[in-house]
Design a protein with these regions (language model features):
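Hydrophobic positions on the alpha1 helix immediately C-terminal to the Walker A/P-loop
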Residues: 47, 51
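N-terminal mitochondrial targeting presequence
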Residues: 1-28, 308
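A glycine- and Lys/Arg-enriched "phosphate-lid" helix/loop adjacent to the NTP-binding pocket
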Residues: 140-214
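Conserved lysine of the Walker
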Residues: 44
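NTP-dependent small-molecule kinase module
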Residues: 2-7, 190-308
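Hydrophobic anchor at the beta1->P-loop junction of P-loop NTPases
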Residues: 36
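Conserved substrate/cofactor phosphate-moiety recognition/catalytic segment
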Residues: 53-104, 140-144
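Glycine-rich phosphate-binding loop used to anchor ATP phosphates in small-molecule kinases
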Residues: 93-172
Length: 308
């Protein structure tokens, strides 16, 4: 007689590894991490989705403040008091809000990007299927620096962000390929005015320019040290077949992925499946007024969240 218990999702651990579960056995030529970046309304989401479909990879849309809501429970989006006390509409309406809203927003988004990147790595190591992501925690800093340049946030926020960024992504492996879509700011503004949400149309052109400068002057040079880089104009990015051809010609002969083996992949998989551990560095104990709340308010919000 066979005993049948309740069905449970088994978590990967050392026993699975001892029994022969190896990441490299599942890998194919497309078992890679690709990221697609660009300014607002640059068409990065469309290109990322097309690449994923063409190469049989998994597409990860850009992580927003509700990323955790969408992947847990029944997918219901919870109020902003459970999501960092922030929202995009308020940011565009008042980017210099004196209560520190702009930094709360970007810090919360960064945490969600870190969580999503961990999910992407876990998917790759578990299934062998490659992933294509719309932005990542590696490029997120261009928004924070643009906010600082525009006077939206205080220097202490910039310093805090740099600290949590360094300690939160150092355990990850960077993307194999970073794709950048270069759309001039005037064209970005035109697209936002034509198809953007009403509050997005208030975005400052100088803020958009700072985002572009951050990508070109800092992100691309830095990521090129460990990852392959492809850059396209908006028109070139429309030709997905040409993009796929360019990807196929890449050698992928640099970066830390080349130094990995089944043992290191085993430890990485253990790390990225522990989502609480992944997010611990994002919540280091520092007194930053913009993102700090009182104990009573914390307790009230916490128990409200538990009751949802």
């Amino acid at each position: 007689r066979i005993h049948v218990g309740s069905k449970q999702n088994l978590q990967y651990g050392w026993l699975a590894y001892m029994l022969g579960d190896r990441a490299t056995k599942k890998f194919t030529e497309h078992s890679k991490v690709f990221t697609v970046d660009g300014n607002l309304s640059s068409g990065k989401g469309k290109l990322a989705q097309q690449i994923a479909e063409k190469l049989g990879m998994k597409y990860f849309p850009e992580a927003d403040i509700h990323y955790l809501d969408r992947i847990t429970g029944d997918g219901t989006l919870l109020p902003e008091k459970f999501n960092g006390f922030c929202n995009l509409e308020r940011f565009y309406n008042d980017p210099k809000c004196p209560d520190g809203h702009s930094y709360r927003l970007q810090a919360w988004v960064f945490g969600n990007r870190v969580l999503q990147y961990a999910d992407a790595l876990e998917h790759l190591l578990t299934t062998g299927q490659g992933v294509v992501m719309e932005r990542s925690p590696y490029s997120d800093f261009v928004f924070l620096e643009a906010m600082f340049n525009q006077g939206y946030i205080h220097k202490r926020c910039l310093d805090h962000y740099k600290e949590i960024k360094e300690i939160s992504i150092c355990e990850f492996l960077p993307p194999h390929l970073a794709i950048y879509i270069d759309v001039p700011v005037p064209e970005v503004q035109k697209r936002i005015q034509e198809k953007g949400k009403p509050y997005e149309k208030k975005v400052s052109p100088s803020y958009l320019q700072d985002i572009e400068d951050g990508y070109k002057k800092t992100f691309l040079p830095e990521i090129s040290e460990t990852s392959e880089v492809l850059q396209y104009t908006a028109t070139e990015a429309e030709d997905v077949e040409k993009v796929i051809e360019d990807i196929e010609y890449l050698k992928f002969d640099k970066g830390p992925w080349l130094e990995q083996d089944d043992v290191s992949f085993h430890h990485l998989r253990l790390y990225v499946q522990d989502k609480d551990g992944v997010l611990d560095p994002v919540a280091i104990p520092r007194f930053i007024p913009e993102i700090t709340i009182g104990g009573n308010e914390y307790d009230k919000t916490y128990y409200e969240y538990r009751s949802v």
